[in-house]
Amino acid sequence: MALVTPRTLSGFKDRLPKEALAKAHLLNKVSNVFMNFGFVPIETPHLEYADVLIKQGSDEIQKELYRFKDHGGRDVALRFDLTVPLARFVSQYKNEVGLPFKRYAIGNVFRGERAQRGRYREFTQCDFDFIGSDSISCDAEILQVIYASLMKLGIEEFTIWLNHRSILNGICEYCGITQEKDINVALRIIDKLDKIGKERVSEELQKELGLNNNQVENLLEYTSIKQQGESESFFRQISFMEEWNDSIKKGIEDLKMLYEVLSSLQMDRDTYRVNFSIARGLGYYTGIVYETTLNALKSIGSVCSGGRYDNLTRTFSKEKMSGVGASIGIDRLLAALEELELLQKRATSARALIVCMDRLYFGYAHLLAESFRCSEIPIEVYPEASKLKKQFTYAHLKGYEFVVVIGENEFNTKTLTLKNMTSGVQIDSISFLKALALIQEE
């Protein structure tokens, strides 16, 4: 019988313990931030009826959808994000969860896009959303969560780029693009501006919408506007655009209101700026939208993005439920943290390893391990009484912070020898309490 070659599909990946532990550590940190703001967890299926998903995603997303017939002949698809399943969830359970509803969800999503650096076809999203209120307070709180999450991860240099879909709609209208379908196509192309550049964006606008050179030039000129200095000066500079139409006026007014709230907080004002090229590729956004880039690693793209979606539940319910939320791209953020050397990677969840010089000492070793665990110190016992060199080689490979050595003297005196694997300092024959204190100090 021929052996099967072990392999994974392009765009899909395994995670070895070091990376999986780093990811779990990251998710634990951001989950704690979510709960500090009062968000509660929910779970939804990976597989949904296709019609649940396809009416909400953009044309681009629908092309990337993993869609098929299941064994029962049902038209199903793998979820491409966690927001559309949320709309279905809230419509289905709104009486049980109550509104306004603040939730977070962590899970894998699937998109059949081209695999490349920082982009996978299966990746983990980490979403937090505020459903049931159109207050600008909710938009501000979502941005607070983004800020707090990145700071918690040790990232201090980042920019949250803000825009408003009404501003983009108004610019399109001013440039002669009036049909909703054409506006959505234009915004999808404009969203690529920072990724593929003006020349290619111009080509796509002319090819897909038949725009003339003057229309393209105007569209690119106004969607290239970015805030450079203080917000007060920036809003004065763009005030002339408010006279063009009501859409632009409303969008700018909403951004001003958001800035008023944010200015009262302890968020660094340099971390959030307006950028009229931010359109977001998903068709359901209706209000303020945002993307977050790392200042030291802009090439990796947005690590957290989102916006307001006042019409998301229209497919499932006649009742209008406003919502706003964001999604952290965990896999992309992990890649960025590793490149920035902010990721501590260990191949074990334990801080310490107990090694024995004889199998007769296993009982004492497990007793010590039990005592350490009762004091919230993750620890494990090496399962064989091998040569110390072999056991220490294993400890180095896994990345333990400490090694506890049990030899004849330690066994007889009910003490232990503790070695700090980072500093190399070793203290012989000390008590359990002394060792515990030393580990807790680190």
From Swiss-Prot:
Entries under InterPro entries matching the protein: aa-tRNA-synth_II, aa-tRNA-synth_II/BPL/LPL, Anticodon-bd, Anticodon-bd_dom_sf, His-tRNA-ligase, HisRS-like_core, HisRS/HisZ
Reactions accelerated catalytically: tRNA(His) + L-histidine + ATP = L-histidyl-tRNA(His) + AMP + diphosphate + H(+)
Cellular component terms (Gene Ontology): cytoplasm
GO biological process, one term: histidyl-tRNA aminoacylation
Keyword terms: Aminoacyl-tRNA synthetase, ATP-binding, Cytoplasm, Ligase, Nucleotide-binding, Protein biosynthesis
Record localization: Cytoplasm
Protein EC: 6.1.1.21
Top enzyme class: ligase
GO MF terms held by the record: ATP binding; histidine-tRNA ligase activity
Major subcellular location class: cytoplasm
Stated family: Belongs to the class-II aminoacyl-tRNA synthetase family.
Subunit architecture: Homodimer.
Protein's UniProt name: Histidine--tRNA ligase
